[in-house]
Design a protein with these regions (language model features):
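Zinc-dependent deaminase
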Residues: 55-121
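Short beta-strand scaffold segments in enzyme catalytic cores
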Residues: 1-7
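Immediate flanking context of iron-sulfur cluster ligation sites
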Residues: 41-53
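A short, polar/charged loop-to-alpha-helix boundary motif
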Residues: 16-30, 34
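Conserved hydrophobic residues forming the short capping helix/wall of the S-adenosyl-L-methionine
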Residues: 35-39
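Short secondary-structure boundary/capping segments
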Residues: 1, 40-41, 90-92
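Residues embedded in well-ordered beta-strands within globular domains across many folds
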Residues: 2, 48-50, 72
């Protein structure tokens, strides 16, 4: 995951769930937290989050709380995706609506994810 603000990569992270034995160590959460720390604010409303996989419910909750400007993701996640696949957490459920673009280089992202998790598990 990468957080970009003003055309500059502010932070980047990858999934550390297995490495840390921590279910909350998703790439999105780690990248958002690092960006907030670097910028000195919990409001990232001028930043865009780029991720390989459509964010899950936990990550979408954090994305909304950080007030990220938009999410761009590669592969749709029909099992747990909460931008559009399983539910749209930021659409009408709160006063925070996060625009998203999905399916960017989807096959390439899906292949990256398959290889990553094959090596981790």
């Amino acid at each position: 995951a990468c957080v970009v603000c003003g055309g500059e990569i502010i932070s980047r992270a990858h999934n550390l769930v297995e490495t840390r034995s921590d279910a909350s160590a998703h790439a999105e959460l780690l990248a958002l937290s690092a960006a907030a720390k670097k910028l000195g604010t919990r409001r990232l409303n001028d930043c865009i989050l780029y991720v390989t996989l459509e964010p899950c419910a936990m990550c979408m909750g954090a994305i909304m709380n950080f007030r990220i400007a938009a999410v761009v993701f590669g592969a749709f996640d029909p099992e747990a995706g909460c931008c559009v696949s399983r539910c749209e957490l930021s659409c009408g459920m709160t006063n925070i609506n996060i625009p998203y673009v999905g399916g960017i280089r989807e096959e390439e992202c899906r292949n990256l994810l398959t290889a990553f998790f094959r090596n981790k598990r």
